Amino acid sequence: MTDSDHEFAPAKISQKPVQRLRCLACMAANRYLHRRVGTFLARLTLAVWGAEVGTGLRVRGRLRVHNEGRLVLGSGVQMNSGPANFVGGERRMAFWIGGGGELAIGDGCGLSNTTIVCLRSITILPGTYVGGGCEIYDTDFHQLDPEDRLLGRGEVPVAPVRIGPKAFVGGFCIILKGVTIGEGAIIGAGSVVTKAVGPYEIWAGAPARFIRRLAPREAPAGVGGAGATT
């Protein structure tokens, strides 16, 4: 090894932590600016569409909003939209509320790249997290009868959706009309939920089915354990 090797080796080693610190600083600054700008634009968009928004809203990325009904966001709601969240990053947070529809998202909820279409009522209760790329619908979008569908006649089935409080919906789930998901329930990633889920139950699959109840060590005091039935 030459003297020059000895001279330059420490310099190369010392540069690594410096570069890492610079990288971390840039990432932190980018996240901060992304969140500040995203939140400002989100509040502006929501105000234009007549939404009722609580304090402490935090948004990364740009929202898509269409509101002909009522849109209510509680305090401390956090949302990621687009590439702000790697999971489901090819999508954006999107709200579509038809005339007469009411979408309410409670305090402290978190959602990422979720598509919500509401024609009657969708309620996401406080402390509920909805993973990246989920879809929540309270409508079938079309008539069931093929002739009615082709002719555009008849009623489109709709039914309210209610989720939480403190529920967790894994990424890329689909929640269909008429579904109720109870307090503290967990829905496995990629599930299609078509029926009611009880409090502190774990469901997964397409269509989703009951897996088990949360064990006593996993759930608050007083909640039944894994041996409980549905």
Show the residue positions of the predicted features.
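Histidine/lysine/aspartate-rich catalytic loop segments that bind and position anionic ligands
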Residues: 125-158
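Beta-rich strand-turn-strand
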Residues: 113-124, 171-186, 191-194
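A short, glycine- and basic residue-enriched loop/turn
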Residues: 160-161, 178-179, 200
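Surface-exposed acidic, glycine/proline-enriched linker/cap segments
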Residues: 151-162, 166, 172, 225-229
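Domain-scale signature associated with acetyltransferase and cell-envelope carbohydrate enzymes
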Residues: 1-137, 164-166, 183, 199, ...
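Conserved catalytic-core motifs of eukaryotic protein kinase domains, centered on the activation segment
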Residues: 140, 147-148, 179, 213-215
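Short conserved catalytic/interaction loops centered on acidic-Pro-aromatic/His motifs
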Residues: 139-146, 182-184, 198-201
